């Protein structure tokens, strides 16, 4: 079974680049995942692809079954989770169209299922929540491909589904670089399960801190569609470079706090 999972939107599943082998829709202790998991190959590498927001039942960010999603991928044997997502920019130098390989997150969500340990005290350690090994793999690929990217970025995760007010956006600029709605709790659930996690984020807009700019879903979709090829190229180059035992830090962190 695949050791690598890719979580993203419809565009990532491209019949021209994704060789479909089978579809599975497993049950988990937390219900069904957000969609069927597509098992196939990208650049000759076997992967499990999951549409985070679903295709038959549309899940807004607050309602995504994050626990079921990560659990299902773990049960399929995945060790590595690569998230492809859209983000807004909170800093001038993070320009729409840029790729960001995030290295930290700040959590401003409010009503999600954050842990698998509701009946047990487990304090997961995530000082560095994104896998340094995976980040380094995709940094090398981005560099090789000549893509405009940022190695490192503080991802601020808001509840959604609404976008920020201008006051919020100005406040967020004081401590974050990019803003989105999906990394939390996906990232920390992966850590609880001992899976490595990285986020390949495409900047689609400047949020609303620029007085003449505003963000809407059409703008996000338009920019994401225009830049999708960069994400696909990054996956095609980076996935074959991921080694089976490339990282032990993430699983050791989960074991160290009693999560595994």
Identify the function of each model-found stretch.
Residues 74-77, 173, 191:
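Non-catalytic positions within long, well-ordered alpha-helices that form the structural scaffold/packing
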Residues 181-219:
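Zn-dependent metallopeptidase/amidohydrolase metal-coordination segment
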Residues 129-174:
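Active-site rim beta-loop-alpha module in soluble metabolic enzymes
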Residues 208-258:
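His/Asp/Glu-rich mid-to-C-terminal helical/loop segments that flank catalytic regions of hydrolases
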Residues 78, 104-106, 139-148, 161, ...:
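Generic secondary-structure signature for well-ordered alpha-helical cores
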Residues 1-127:
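Metabolite-binding pocket within alpha/beta catalytic cores that recognizes anionic/polar moieties
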């Amino acid at each position: 079974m695949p050791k690598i999972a890719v979580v993203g939107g419809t565009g990532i599943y491209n019949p021209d680049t994704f060789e479909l082998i089978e579809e599975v829709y497993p049950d988990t202790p937390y219900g069904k995942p957000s969609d069927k998991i597509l098992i196939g190959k990208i650049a000759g590498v076997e992967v499990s692809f999951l549409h985070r927001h679903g295709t038959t039942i549309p899940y807004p960010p607050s309602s995504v079954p994050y626990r079921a999603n990560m659990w299902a991928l773990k049960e399929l044997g995945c060790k590595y989770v690569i998230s492809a997502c859209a983000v807004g920019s909170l800093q001038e130098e993070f320009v729409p169209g840029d790729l960001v390989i995030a290295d930290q997150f700040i959590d401003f969500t409010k009503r999600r299922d954050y842990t698998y340990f509701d009946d047990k005290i487990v304090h997961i350690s995530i000082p560095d929540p994104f896998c340094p090994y995976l980040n380094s793999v995709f940094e090398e690929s981005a560099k090789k491909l000549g893509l405009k990217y940022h190695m490192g970025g503080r991802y601020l995760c808001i509840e959604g589904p609404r976008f920020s007010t201008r006051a919020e956006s100005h406040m967020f600029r004081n401590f974050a670089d990019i803003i989105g709605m999906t990394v939390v709790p996906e990232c920390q659930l992966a850590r609880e399960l001992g899976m490595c996690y990285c986020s390949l984020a495409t900047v689609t807009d400047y949020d609303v801190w620029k007085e003449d700019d505003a963000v809407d879903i059409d703008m996000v979709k338009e920019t994401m569609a225009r830049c999708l090829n960069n994400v696909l190229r990054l996956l095609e180059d980076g996935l074959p470079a991921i080694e089976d035992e490339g990282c032990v830090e993430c699983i050791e962190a989960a074991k160290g706090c009693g999560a595994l």
